[in-house]
Structure formats: C-alpha cells, structure tokens
Amino acid sequence: MVALLMLASLQTGLAGRWDLTATSGGLTYPMWVEILAGPPPAGRLQNKSGHALPLTAVVIDGNWIHFPMPSEEPVANPAQFSAVLQGDSLTGEIRGPGNARIRVTGSRAPALERATPPVWGTPIDLLEGGIAGWRPEDPKGKNNWRMANGELVNSGSGTNLITRATFTDFKLHIEVNVPKAGNSGIYLRGRHEVQVQDDYGKPPHNRHMGGIYGQVTPLSLPARPAGEWQAFDITFIGRRVTVVLNGTTIIDNAEIPGITGGALDSREGEPGPIMLQGDHTAVRYRNIRIVPAR
C-alpha cells in the first residue's frame, strides 16, 4: 500500500503540462509534453513540427519518466525520451540511433489564468507602415513577402513573417485569401497556430481551417472557396481563445493546452509576436488590426 501511494504521489508530481526546450548541436527548439498520471500513465508530445501525438509505453520510475518518441508512422527503433523531475523542472535527453543525444530541459507550463477581464487599449494597424513593422523569421532564408495594393503577399514557400512588436492578450482582426490547395497559419504570440488552409466543404478538424493546430477543434467550418477573402476575428486572453470565421464563432473561449508545431519558443508565459506562416504556399493577407490589452 505504501509503495502504491508513493507511486501515485510521484505520478502526480510528474503529471501536467511542461514547456520544453531541446538543444542539439548548439541549436535550440521548443517542445511540449502533457503527462497524465493514469493508471496507466499516458500523455501527448508536441515536437518542433507537426502536431501533438499520443504517448505510448510510458514508464515512471521514481522521479524519472521514460517513453519512446511518438511518430505518425511506425518506427522500428524510435528515439527514447528520458527526464527526471527536480522541483518544478524537468531535465533529460532524447537518445536516438547511434547514441545521438538531444538535451531537454523544461518547466511546468503556466496556467495563464486572468483574475479580471482585460481593459482594451488602442487599436493598431499592423500594416500601417507597410512591411516595416515585420521581419522574416529566418533572415538568411528566402523571403517572398511583399506589400502590393495594401495587401501582404507571400508568393511561395519561404520564410515566415513576424511582427516586430510583441503582445500578451489581444483582439486580432485579419483577412486572408488562400489559393487552391493553399496552406498558411496565424501564430498567436508566435506559439499557437490558427490553421489557414483551403478547406472549403470539409468537416471541422483541429488541423483544418480555423482550428488551433492539433489542439482545438472548431465547432463548425464556414470556410469559403479558395480565392475568396475570408475574415478572422480572434480574441486571445491567457490560454483562452475565441475564433470567429466569416462571422461565425467556431471556437468559443476554449483553452489552448500548449504550443503547436512551428512555434518560435515554448515560453508560454511571455508576450509574443504575431507570426504568419510562409513556408508552405502562396497566400495573401490584408486589414490586419490588433487591439492589445493595457
């Protein structure tokens, strides 16, 4: 009985959501993991790209947690994740083929609960100065973004575009025109992607138009055909997001559990920029206005 209680206590300590940073070859990238105590223990992991995937074969041994890295396709010898709980931090590694190692550190994800409703500030036109208020995510990458007829245009696959300003809580209006089979995204605080995609006539899904990629599924999907302008009105307060697409509320004050693939970092408690995804296909944006909380 004592052993069972100790195990339950340790599982509870490890349980929860963790904002992770992986370091490999001097480069860092964000990850996120959600650990469910069980029994049996389970969870989900968000790697640097793609969407959050379920964990299997989770083993908790004292203050340690171990599991094979999840993948969408079967892998004969998956990399192994191991980390130890030290206070409110996780420290560990991902060990891959050939004994390659990626260092992982993490902290418990903040609740981001707001005690009082925000007081909204002055609206900001994010295109008022053209493209001057934006910067490429990768300064050395191919930058296909330009201003044309008051629109922010991406002509093809290249780097993402990021606002120079950062925001905490805000209301964002943004209009988008997606071509046939087009794919882009609107990253809130640079960490949580609202999917932008040619999904006319498709059912709602967390990886379809308006979904929080791999995290939150819309209630409906009033997407318009490719080539037509569509309007988003997004309110983001703490972890809570409301998404209105073409006048219909498709996500209503839903919690975003954690970062999505392609996030700039995993520091969820900090302000972050608006990032527009440009590494997939051509896309056009216009009328981008944000009202930050004071």
Where are these regions (language model features)?
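Sec-dependent N-terminal signal peptides
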Residues: 1-10
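Carbohydrate-interacting regions of secretory-pathway proteins
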Residues: 13-37, 44-294
